[in-house]
Amino acid sequence: MYKTKIFYKSGLFLHGRRYIYRKPKETNYWKNYIIVPLYINDKEVGIDKTISEPEYILLDIILYGPLKIKLSEYFNLNNKIIDRTTTYKKLLEKNTIYGINFNFTFPILLNFKDSENKYQLKEYLDFNNILQIYLIENKKYIYRELRSKFDWDEYNVLKIRLYVNHKSVIFIKDKYLEEPTELEYIVLDLFLLGPLEKEYSENYKIIYLINERNKRYKDMYDMGEIYGINIRFDKLDYFKFLNSEYSTEERIYEKILFIYIIT
């Protein structure tokens, strides 16, 4: 079993061989912090009594690093913190700035306390020479893999005959009637199932729109208006298509819904 070692001078706790922990500074510490005038959400540190404990903890993490960090990342991150605070001091000494205001919303604190990799800092100098720093949480993404071409014969979301550029997506006796190209399978996959990469906050919206559209196709099939879908494209700009920068046109011919993808 690993033993916990304490670095008495630094106040760091080494737990086993994986993480380093530290405690945040007490509130009274910040009342005497005069390296540079500090503000949190426009409230002056050490003077404004309405600054909350979470705000003080976040200020502590910005200037001294995470409360919990992997041992393997400690030295690189420590150097990064030192460079950041040194830059602030130099700006103050040169009278380039008169203070620093850290702007953030409380949900950021949940991810911010453990890792610098989960957020980014956006800075700008305002008219009063106060350095405004905004903490912005990095975007999170959801990923999925392309569907195997051998799985399309079992595709049961629409239960409709599928075609890509007039080529039938049906698997019979280990041979396709006319096999779509790799690009055609990719277009089929992305159009019916959505992007391979979605921002977490946009995932619900994208899935909802895709499901609503596919439901409309299914309703048309159930009402006997169509019995198949033919996805058509010509001279497709693949990069625009990947970024969902395309439009569609639809028309029905002999009970086949033709969907033209235009980039």
Curated annotation (Swiss-Prot):
It comes from the Eukaryota. The keyword Plastid applies. It holds the Pfam family DUF613. Its main location: plastid. Keywords: Plastid. The keyword Plastid applies. It is found in: Plastid. GO terms for cellular component: plastid. Belongs to the A.longa ORF167/ORF288 family. This is Uncharacterized 32.5 kDa protein in rpl14-rpl12 intergenic region. It comes from Euglena longa.
